Amino acid sequence: MAKAVFTTDGSYKPLFDHIKKAGGADLAEKICAESNAAYERLVNSDHTNLNNTAKMHWKQCCERAAIYTTVRKYYPESVLEWINESLEKFGLNAAAALNRIMRFPGMKALFLPIMRSMAKSMFGSKGGFRNQFGLVTKQEVHFDILECPYCKYMKELDCPELGPGFCKSDEYSYGNLRDFTFERTQTLAIGGEKCDFCMRRNSSIVGKTT
């Protein structure tokens, strides 16, 4: 039996807390089980021959679509708000974890090179993206995503309204770093020509090796 993707106390805990308050713990467990079953159906319904990098993105889209379409049957007016609340909490927790990591010697200097490497490997052609790099220095990294599989997959899964949530996750996590500034002016999911991405090391720490 496949490991459950969703638990009531996992990354979607805020959503399930709302369900518990509205309908009780038993209903929350029922919806959780239905969401896991929906995920298994979706993830195996298409794109079964993807490489591991692209498969990771497909799985994330299926996960989001599964819980959204399941909860929507019960709480159509609230589901999107509850999902976005869960995404915000998860992103802020990720930012807090990154801020703790930045306290270790040398990590601030390594962060931008790591971001650039991740953008090329995880968010490059192997993952189904088309991106274009701009300015890359020790102080800042700029790149644009011109084609995004999240937009494609969410349309295929008939949930295009979930696309912007993936973009907001960047803002929650990278936009709340203590030592770096995240800048973005547009995204593909909200009708932009690209997803622009700029991560800049704050001036107060430029030149430091820590």
Task: Annotate each predicted stretch with a short phrase.
Residues Q132-A189:
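Short, hydrophobic/π-rich interface segment
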Residues L188-N202:
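C-terminal edge-of-domain segments
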Residues K59, E63-A65, T69-L157:
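Amphipathic interaction/junction segments at domain boundaries or subunit interfaces
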Residues C62, A66, S169, G192:
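Short, well-structured alpha-helical interface segments that form or flank functional binding sites
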Residues P149, S203-I205:
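Short loop/turn segments at secondary-structure transitions that flank enzyme active sites
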Residues M1-V71:
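N-terminal, charged low-complexity regulatory/assembly segments
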Residues G207-T210:
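Short, charged, solvent-exposed linker or helix-capping segments at domain edges/interfaces
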